[in-house]
Amino acid sequence: MSASYEPNERRAYAASLSRFRYDDGNDRSTLNLSADQRLLSRPYFLLNGLANLYTSRSSRDDAPYFNPSRDASLELGLRADHLAWRDYDNHFRHRLSVNAGRYWQEGYGSAWIPSLSYRHEWQWAMGRVLSYGVSWARPVYDGARETRYGFDAELRWGE
């Protein structure tokens, strides 16, 4: 179940509550709250502050997959959005997001978790958008820090 509220283009809030029932008898519940607040608006540049709070719990801590009995995180970040080129319905923009926060897992304590992402967005007609990006993060699982690199792409076709 999820809900979002955007009172205007400068502010947005979202909340989600999920329950997962696995075949092995594990029940996992999660709660996620997020906020996005515009800090600076210029004709071709936007700067937003980001906040995210997450917590989860599971009924089984001996599962053969990553499944903490309880965990939580709080992240704060900034997203810079630059509209580099625009011609009527066509544009190119790029975005840089920088986040840092604290992750806690029962039995393993807490650790800082940084992340970065950089994206391009090309729109060549109304509703026709190609977006792609790279990301880097240093999450912690069962007390061990890992490095995660990512690439994703999205093609939107329609209004």
Regions found by a protein language model. Give the residues of each.
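Membrane-embedded beta-strand positions in outer-membrane beta-barrel channels/transporters
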Residues: M1-S2, S16, T30-S34, P64, ...
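Membrane-embedded beta-strand positions of outer-membrane beta-barrel proteins
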Residues: A3, Y13-L17, L47-A51, L76, ...
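Short loop/turn motifs that connect adjacent beta-strands in outer-membrane beta-barrel proteins
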Residues: Y5-R10, R38-N48, A84-R93, Q123-V129, ...
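Transmembrane beta-strands of outer-membrane beta-barrel pores
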Residues: P7-E9, L17-D23, Q37-L39, A51-S59, ...
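Gram-negative (and chloroplast) outer-membrane scaffold detector with strong preference
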Residues: N32-L39, P43-R57, Y65-H82, N90-R93
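Structured C-terminal portions of repeat-based eukaryotic scaffold domains
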Residues: R79-Q105, G109-A125
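Outer-membrane beta-barrel "beta-signal"
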Residues: R145-E159
